[in-house]
Amino acid sequence: MTTAENREGYKRVMLKLGGEMFGGGKVGIDPDVVQNVARQIAEVSKSGVEVAVVIGGGNFFRGAELQQRGLDRSRSDYMGMLGTVMNCLALQDFLEQEGVDCRVQTAIQMTQVAEPYLPLRASRHLEKGRVVIFGAGMGMPYFSTDTTAAQRALEIGCEVLLMAKAVDGVYSDDPRTNPEAELFHEITPREVIEKGLKVADATAFSLCMDNKMPILVFNLLTDGNIARAVAGERIGTLVDGNVSTR
């Protein structure tokens, strides 16, 4: 049983990063933000934890939003996938500056800049201490990068899906508009559904729930939180069918 006072640390994790964070709230890439994220990931990787990463592309394109402006949804989603690859390459560069060996694998083949997505090869990279960054989403339209993170985490045998956000975890209401909103420290997937809470998109959440993959939602903007999350410190919100309290 996982309790509010004690969580076990993890050896292989999937880190989901939103693309908007890479832009610092603007279009494009904010080098200071990416460098800070790279330093946090490097600290965790050098401690012996195997780290895989999926990054969104919202700082460049969002397929659903482009569709609302009249673009074909499939083509819009492919544009978003290319945006994720730009984020992946930026993170790879900053990780290498931190002395961390890193590989980018993409669901759309672009062999001059990245390996194709091969789960067995990705696992071998992780075993050798390399960080693996997955780009181009699922390689198909209509699938979010949340869903990509959940699917990749399951396929390469991660122990937890770490959802990095700009808030401290999952709240009963929007904490930006309701100062009385309650932060859940531990909660079951069933409670998430019953309370109508937002953790990840529906497909990603269903994948994790059906396959008993824990999700830890935490604040990336607090320096050192990736290491704390991996070590099992009581931060953020743990969504797990085995939690005993919250």
UniProtKB/Swiss-Prot annotation:
It is found in: Cytoplasm. Disulfide bonds: none annotated. Gene3D superfamilies: Acetylglutamate kinase-like (3.40.1160.10). Keywords: ATP-binding, Cytoplasm, Kinase, Nucleotide-binding, Pyrimidine biosynthesis, Transferase. UMP binds at residues 57, 77, 138-145. Homohexamer. Catalyzes the reversible phosphorylation of UMP to UDP. This is Uridylate kinase. The gene is pyrH.
